[in-house]
A protein has these predicted regions:
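Histidine/acidic residue-rich metal-binding segments in metalloenzymes
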Residues: 1-120
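His/Asp/Glu-enriched, well-ordered alpha-helical/loop segment
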Residues: 19-39, 44-49, 119-120, 125-196
Length: 196
């Protein structure tokens, strides 16, 4: 919700200056802002009886929006990092929506395992290192992820969070089915062999 984000940014700038520390990024792009935006879209989908895919869920609260007609996607970054990582990674992990509390990350991990989240995406948005310098207002949002997505998800598999079969569903089968991508998402005769 842009109004909430703008209000939060204004409050942080008043409190901390023109470029507040990146540690407050999750307070600017807050749980409330994420939920209100997603809930508005979900309400419209229910009202008009249409399908909706909500990309980049980042909070536990958004998980309640999943239904048979409303699917959810989380990014690798939101499944791997938490707000505690801003202390060491700084703006290198600044993305939109902001990476949230450890409790949110853990809830997203449970949701990829139990099926409430049906797709894992990358939100691949690399930037020059110089563009990632600064705080919540000046550092560019986004990070490279395509080349790291599989190895990162394999780490979650090694931790016992998901199985290899579930990983394949989240990153291959489900996206192809959800978006009706012809001859993709499976290793089958006649399908594109885009596995390398």
């Amino acid at each position: 919700d842009t109004d909430i984000i703008n209000r939060n940014m204004e409050q942080m700038k008043k409190a901390y200056g023109d470029d507040p520390d990146v540690m407050v990024h999750p307070l600017i792009r807050s749980e409330e802002a994420c939920y209100e935006s997603a809930a508005l879209a979900a309400g419209l989908a229910r009202q008009f009886g249409t399908r909706l895919h909500i990309a980049h869920v980042s909070t536990e609260k958004e998980l309640d929006l999943a239904t048979d007609n409303i699917s959810l996607e989380a990014t690798v970054a939101h499944l791997f990092f938490s707000s505690a990582d801003y202390a060491t990674k700084r703006a290198l992990i600044k993305c939109n929506p902001a990476i949230k509390r450890p409790e949110d990350r853990d809830a997203l991990r449970r949701a990829i395992a139990d099926g409430r989240i049906s797709v894992v995406g990358t939100d691949h948005a690399p930037h020059l290192l110089a563009d990632k310098q600064g705080g919540a207002a000046k550092a560019t949002s986004g990070m490279p992820m395509v080349q790291f997505s599989l190895v990162t998800m394999l780490e979650l598999m090694d931790q016992g969070i998901i199985s290899i079969e579930r990983l394949v569903e989240l990153m291959c089968h489900n996206p192809a089915e959800l978006f009706a991508i012809n001859k993709r998402g499976y290793l089958r005769p006649g399908y594109h062999a885009d596995i390398a």
